[in-house]
Amino acid sequence: MKKYTRQRLILDLIEENEIRTQEELSDYLEAHGVRATQATISRDIKELRISKVQTREGEYHYAIIDTVHDSLNERLDKIFRSAVLTIKHNEDMVIIKTISHTATVCGMAITNAKLDNIAGILTGNDTIYITVEDKSGLEKLVSEIKSIIR
C-alpha cells in the first residue's frame, strides 16, 4: 500500500474512532488489510500532525489538529461577514448578493461550512445562487447561512 493511501486511511480511522494508542491504531489498520510497523505508524502520526487530546472523562485519544484549515476557514468567514450585502430566497433557492468580485470567496466559505441541504452553489461576480436538495429545509438553510455572518 502506498504511503498516501495508508495515511489517508489513518486520518479516516482517527476521525471515525476514538483511538487511544498506536497499538490500537495498528489493529484498526490490520482490520482494513494494512500491515505497518510501529515505527511507520509513529512517523505517519508525526507527518500528519496528529495529537493526543483529553476527553471530558480525562482519557486521551488521537485527534487531527488542523490549524491551517481552521485558520483558512476563519479568514473566509471574516470575508463572508464583510462582503455579503443581502441574503434572500424564493421557493427554490437562496440568492446572496455580495460586494463586487467577492462571490467566489464567499461561496467557498459556504462550502467549507458543510451545511446540510445544499444541492449546488453557483457563483458569479457579485451573486451566489444556492439550490437546495429539499425545499422544506430552505428556511433552515437560510438561517444557517445568516449565522455565519453573526
UniProtKB/Swiss-Prot annotation:
GO terms for cellular component: cytoplasm. It is found in: Cytoplasm. Its main location: cytoplasm. Keywords: Amino-acid biosynthesis, Arginine biosynthesis, Cytoplasm, DNA-binding, Repressor, Transcription, Transcription regulation. Pathway: Amino-acid biosynthesis; L-arginine biosynthesis [regulation]. The keyword Nucleus does not apply. GO terms for biological process: L-arginine biosynthetic process; protein complex oligomerization; regulation of arginine biosynthetic process. InterPro entries: Arg_repress, Arg_repress_C, Arg_repress_C_sf, Arg_repress_DNA-bd, WH-like_DNA-bd_sf, WH_DNA-bd_sf. It comes from the Bacteria. The keyword Transcription applies. GO terms for molecular function: arginine binding; DNA binding; DNA-binding transcription factor activity. Belongs to the ArgR family. PANTHER family: ARGININE REPRESSOR (PTHR34471:SF1). Regulates arginine biosynthesis genes. This is Arginine repressor. The lineage of its organism: Bacteria, Bacillati, Bacillota, Tissierellia, Tissierellales. The gene is argR.
